Amino acid sequence: MSVFVDIHVLQTLPPSNPNRDDTGAPKSATFGGVQRMRISSQAIKRATRQDFEGKIADGNYGVRTKKIVELVARTITEKRPDLEAESIKLAEMGLKAIGFKLAEPRGNKSDKELKESGFLVFLSAKQIEHVADALISVAHEDDPAAAFKELKPRSLVDTDHSIDIALFGRMVAEPNALNVDAACQVAHAIGVGAVEHEYDYYTAVDDEKKRNDEADEGAGMIGTIEFASATVYRYATINVDLLRENLGDDAVTDRAVELFVDSFVRSMPTGKVTTFANRTLPDAVLVQVRNDQPINMSGAFEEPIVAGQHGFAKPAIKRFVEFEARLRELTGLEAVESLVSWTTPRGESFSELGKQVRLASLGETAAEAVRGTR
């Protein structure tokens, strides 16, 4: 029996541009025959991962970089300052033995630049330490490379996955044996109704020009910023069994569930945030622990909400509550546990869907519900 944690969020965004396309416009998608505001899953995952970065104990957070030679060499030097002169050579040897292809940085002719991997590599702090420790142990062997190969070097980076690697996965082109399947899936956030993009025309004043009576009074700079507003439906799911497999420990798995739920619910990509300050909390949240399958409920909004005097959020909440109840009635699929939270009076109808939990305790309570399934 597989266990899943589904997270459903309805959140109002004021005029903003949290996730823009290559033209600078807020991302969008056609759904239900109309254009909707969209926030990409990649941007949401990045914001979620950044949010729980400071909440994870040392070693349980990963780093994604091409500069793996620099990372390993620095760790060797920190542990054994006497090996500083050899650290780069050792790091390159070890990483090549693991299977990473290293090359000179593109477009940089500096002799000080160390070799890089050809792609971003996602490693946990513990894995970097394991590689450094193994290299230190063979540093004074007659043939360090041969001695290192005897340590089964790939195993050094295929155990002790950090929480973020276990959740979001790791794709390695070479060696692909180091791939880690992601335990979470994140949907693109989608507006519940049609969106209209607008433009903010702005001018920047040249302070020195303003002080000069003889200078022209024109602006120092003019431009436009495209923005939109919407109530969006956000969804993510965690495969708890796969998360446990990736992490190898029940307690760490529970902590990962807690962190992900809290950070997914309360984080948001920060595009143009200094211009729009669009840091809102969700209007309403439903977290369900299931033992059947994940269920994305975006179908509740395939027919776009048409805003009236009550805006988008209130009718969207009503629509979602009715959709979820009807879905249970028609399918017979019931969650093991349903937890709800809301931050505005219009979200109170979510009380029909499950047990009310304060937003600050949602992740902790979800982790407790997961423990109850064992």
Label each PLM-derived region with a short phrase:
Residues 1-38, 42-374:
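Basic polyanion-binding and macromolecular-assembly surfaces
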